[in-house]
Regions:
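Bacterial Sec-dependent N-terminal signal peptides
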Residues: 2-42
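Low-complexity, intrinsically disordered segments exposed to solvent
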Residues: 26-247
Length: 247
């Protein structure tokens, strides 16, 4: 009887410790929204065709708007080419289930394809106080391969209302090139700002800010760009339904 009681107590102790460990894990941190890394250029692109735009300086609306559209297109090109691998890696994480590591850290591990090549991604999220620290490591095998390259990192608020990303150019040129600051209101991202932070680059500190606001002109771009001799600014606001707006 004594052995039976001792064994039962042992099982209860093990069960208690196991349950306690599960409780200590808590829930995995919520991934920042995909829109926190990728600006939605679709509304702006559709507004470039057949839209009516006015400008503060009469007669300059066409050239100003066309240049703004070109500049926005450059940012879109950067995201869709230079940074397509880390962006694709982040998008793929939403269909994966994380596993608990330790020290309030969870990991998403999976494979994905970008530019006709296969990669392995390892995204970690560690909760520290009111923030989550994110790190994305990417591995490529074969030609031009590399292992566990930290392609981007960042932080987000635990409540999911905002955060920041830092993206590195490539495994061959591992220097920080893009900073993304984002904020969220309700179920949608209210503002995203791309800032070019690559050192020794004349375009450093150039930025593009995209946001959604209330009112008739409910979307906007603010573009701070380098003309080759100086920095200038353009602000574009438009209605996402009618595609009309102003520069």
């Amino acid at each position: 009887m004594k052995r039976y009681t001792t064994g039962l107590l042992g099982l209860l102790l093990i069960a208690s410790l196991t349950t306690g460990c599960k409780k200590d894990k808590g829930d995995p941190p919520v991934l920042p929204p995909a829109e926190s890394m990728v600006v939605d250029f679709s509304n702006f692109a559709s507004a470039t065709k057949g839209a009516s735009f006015s400008a503060d300086a009469k007669g300059t609306e066409n050239s100003t708007y066309e240049f703004a559209a070109l500049t926005a297109g450059v940012w879109k090109l950067i995201i869709n080419t230079t940074l397509i691998v880390p962006v694709s890696a982040f998008k793929a994480s939403f269909s994966e289930a994380p596993e608990y590591l330790d020290d309030k850290t969870w990991q998403w591990s999976y494979t994905f394809t970008a530019l006709s090549a296969s990669y392995t991604a390892r995204l970690t999220g560690q909760t520290v106080a009111s923030e989550v620290i994110w790190k994305m490591y990417i591995t490529k095998t074969g030609n031009g391969g590399f292992t566990d390259f930290l392609w981007f990192e960042g932080t987000s608020k635990v409540d999911g209302t905002g955060g920041q990303w830092i993206l590195y150019q490539s495994a061959q040129a591992p220097q920080a090139c893009l900073q993304v600051d984002w904020s969220r209101s309700g179920d949608s991202v209210g503002k995203v700002t791309y800032t070019w932070i690559k050192n020794s680059d004349p375009f450093k500190t150039s930025y593009l800010e995209y946001g959604m606001v209330t009112g008739d002109l409910d979307a906007y771009f603010i573009i701070h760009y380098y003309t080759g001799t100086k920095f200038s600014d353009i602000e574009i606001r438009w209605n996402t339904t009618t595609k009309n707006g102003r520069v």
